[in-house]
């Protein structure tokens, strides 16, 4: 489904260990690495979509994670022009996402990238909290920076400030308005919330 502005509702997942390292996976038959993410079905809430995508892309069940929180509202990014299919009845120009922070409480043996017949990833590893902002494909760097910036205070309550650290300068530049990686659209301004996160009750729009 695509909203009237051309954005597809989507969820993103930051899966974090107790030490602040996050799950980082390589897409099948591609060199690109990213966080798990996926589109929402019309009958799903963001939370329901998140658990479905978690199962499909990592093999994990709800009992293998603890849901810590989510970004406030939708964060948007635009697709590069080469990826926009103009001949479709509904043209998708980008994604609007809710990002979830999950603490991994299971065992690594629970991670199964081949859980479905069409796996999204073929390899994974743990990386530092801010690493993905500088290594994801360029057009996603702005939304990654915004998502991790919102979730970092909550991550620090689990892993500690030293383990999570602060956003590196290059990652900060990806988030700042005017950056080529930040995208043309930015989330609408909302009242600041303590800790940068909202409760998990998020309504679809």
UniProtKB/Swiss-Prot annotation:
So which cofactors does this thing need?
a divalent metal cation
Which cysteines bridge via disulfide bonds?
none
Q: Which residues form the Nudix hydrolase domain?
A: 6-149
One example of the protein's molecular function in GO is: pyrophosphatase activity
Class of the enzyme per the UniProt entry, highest EC level:
hydrolase
Skewed-composition ranges (Basic residues): 186-195
EC number(s) from the headed UniProt entry? 3.6.1.-
Listed Gene3D superfamilies? Nucleoside Triphosphate Pyrophosphohydrolase (3.90.79.10)
User: In chain numbering, where does the motif Nudix box fall?
Assistant: 38-59
Q: Which residue ranges does the record annotate as region Disordered?
A: 178-205
Question: What job does this protein perform?
Answer: Accelerates the degradation of transcripts by removing pyrophosphate from the 5'-end of triphosphorylated RNA, leading to a more labile monophosphorylated state that can stimulate subsequent ribonuclease cleavage.
- Stated family: Belongs to the Nudix hydrolase family. RppH subfamily.
Database matches in PANTHER family: ADP-RIBOSE PYROPHOSPHATASE, DIHYDRONEOPTERIN TRIPHOSPHATE DIPHOSPHATASE
Q: Which NCBIfam families match?
A: PRK00714.1-4, PRK00714.1-5
This one is known as: RNA pyrophosphohydrolase
Species per Swiss-Prot/TrEMBL record:
Xanthomonas campestris pv. campestris (strain ATCC 33913 / DSM 3586 / NCPPB 528 / LMG 568 / P 25)
């Amino acid at each position: 489904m695509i909203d009237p502005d051309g954005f597809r509702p989507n969820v993103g997942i930051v899966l974090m260990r107790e030490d602040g390292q996050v799950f980082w996976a390589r897409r099948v038959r591609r060199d690109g690495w990213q966080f798990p993410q996926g589109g929402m079905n019309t009958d799903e809430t963001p939370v329901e979509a998140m658990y479905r995508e978690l199962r499909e892309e990592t093999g994990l069940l709800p009992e293998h994670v603890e849901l810590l929180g989510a970004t406030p509202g939708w964060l948007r990014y635009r697709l590069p022009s080469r990826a926009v299919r103009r001949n479709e009845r509904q043209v998708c120009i980008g994604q609007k996402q809710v990002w979830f922070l999950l603490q991994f409480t299971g065992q690594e043996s629970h991670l199964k990238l081949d859980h479905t017949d069409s796996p999204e990833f073929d390899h994974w590893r743990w990386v530092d909290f801010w690493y993905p902002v500088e290594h994801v494909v360029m057009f996603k760097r702005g939304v990654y920076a915004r998502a991790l910036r919102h979730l970092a205070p909550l991550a620090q309550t689990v892993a500690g400030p030293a383990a999570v650290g602060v956003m590196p300068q290059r990652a900060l530049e990806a988030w700042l308005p005017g950056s080529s990686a930040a995208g043309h659209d930015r989330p609408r301004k909302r009242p600041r919330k303590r800790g940068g996160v909202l409760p998990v009750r998020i309504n679809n729009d």
